[in-house]
């Protein structure tokens, strides 16, 4: 990767949604830079209000001390949450902002948070966003904001598959990669599971995470989905790696979970919103999923049919997907985009 005279040798990342900051820092450090990630402080869990208040004050003071020390060594700050502005604004200085979802998609429209989000977005030297659906929420405030496609770890180690351990089976299965919530298209996923269970041989299991809305979780189980606990990264990735096919969320975008399936060359059935997956960025064109922009996100029947087709297609005839992830969603690709954004902003 080309290097300029200064070239952002030291950058401090605040927050780490979807491990984006960790993957960016790892890629940067492999080039000889010295980037660091400082997770944002979390509110302590305690049984009573007094303990929570004391714990919050102590943790806040501890975190701010670490933040200040880290900033002295790395004055350039890449902030991964607009909501965090009141807690870090006192020391930010000139910063880059990276938006990952809820803050710009939802919070900006809530009166209690609109001003906070506006200040964070408009005062940043450069603004990045992680998924194409966020663009429409940013264009009025920062039309020049840059898409940095979600990076995916391409070197995730092998791990124990907890589904195989729980089910005491090494048989074939279809994995629903997303949590069971309406915002992820949970109702359509349940209906697709029903269609699949009615058509699949009983030797092929349906597997999903015990994560999401309780009513949808119950419905998924009734549809024949074996639910396994929410998993740490390597185990979750192993469940994806061992799947015969994966069904993604039906919200019209690819999040980290869907991209991890593509990184493992596992067939992914997912609808993509054509308003978002356009020609505005190379990563949004010819996405190698089953369905894509031609698939109606409410069409559970077609989702099931595509899943069956993927299962019946020999591996040698499936489109390779890992190479596409390497090209557009690798940590190196994300780092290249971020550095270009820094330079374009004169940061």
Feature-to-residue mapping (PLM):
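Membrane-proximal helix-turn-helix segments that form the acceptor-binding/catalytic region
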Residues: 65-72, 109-127
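Active-site proximal beta-strand in glycosyltransferases
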Residues: 76-78, 90-107, 127-128
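Short His-centered aromatic/hydrophobic patch
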Residues: 79-84, 251
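Donor nucleotide-sugar binding/catalytic pocket of nucleotide-sugar-dependent glycosyltransferases
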Residues: 118, 122-161
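Conserved donor-binding/catalytic core segment of Leloir-type glycosyltransferases
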Residues: 159-184, 190-197, 207
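Nucleotide-activated donor-binding/catalytic signature segment of Leloir-type glycosyltransferases, i.e.
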Residues: 215-234, 242-245
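Acidic donor-binding loop of glycosyltransferase active sites
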Residues: 241-253, 266-267
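A charged, aromatic-enriched C-terminal amphipathic alpha-helix characteristic of glycosyltransferases
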Residues: 294-302, 311-343
């Amino acid at each position: 990767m080309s290097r300029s005279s200064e070239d952002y040798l030291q950058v401090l990342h605040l927050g780490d949604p979807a491990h984006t900051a960790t993957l960016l820092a790892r890629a940067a450090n492999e080039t000889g830079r010295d980037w660091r990630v400082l997770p944002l402080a979390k509110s302590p869990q305690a049984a009573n209000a007094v303990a929570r208040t004391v714990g919050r004050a102590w943790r806040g003071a501890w975190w701010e001390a670490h933040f200040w020390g880290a900033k002295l060594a790395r004055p350039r700050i890449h902030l991964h949450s607009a909501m965090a502005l009141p807690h870090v604004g006192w020391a930010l200085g000139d910063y880059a902002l990276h938006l990952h979802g809820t803050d710009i998609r939802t919070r900006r429209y809530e009166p209690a948070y609109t001003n906070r989000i506006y200040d964070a977005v408009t005062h940043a030297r450069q603004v990045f966003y992680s998924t194409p659906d966020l663009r429409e929420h940013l264009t009025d405030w920062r039309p020049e904001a840059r898409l940095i496609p979600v990076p995916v770890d391409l070197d995730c180690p092998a791990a124990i598959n907890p589904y195989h351990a729980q089910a005491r089976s090494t048989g074939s299965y279809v994995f629903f990669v997303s949590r069971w919530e309406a915002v992820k298209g949970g109702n359509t996923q349940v209906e697709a599971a029903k269609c699949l269970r009615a058509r699949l041989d009983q030797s092929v299991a349906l597997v999903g995470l015990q994560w999401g809305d309780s009513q949808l979780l119950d419905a998924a189980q009734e549809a024949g989905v074996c639910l396994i606990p929410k998993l740490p990264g390597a185990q979750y990735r192993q469940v994806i790696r061992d799947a015969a096919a994966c069904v993604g969320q039906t919200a019209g975008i690819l999040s980290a979970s869907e991209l991890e399936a593509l990184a493992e060359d596992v067939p992914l059935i997912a609808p993509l919103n054509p308003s978002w997956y356009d020609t505005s960025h190379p990563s949004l064109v010819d996405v190698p999923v089953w369905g894509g922009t031609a698939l109606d996100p409410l069409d559970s029947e077609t989702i099931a049919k595509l899943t069956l087709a993927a299962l019946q297609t020999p591996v040698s005839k499936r489109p390779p997907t890992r190479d596409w992830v390497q090209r557009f969603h690798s940590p190196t690709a994300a780092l290249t985009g971020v550095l270009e954004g820094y330079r374009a902003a004169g940061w």
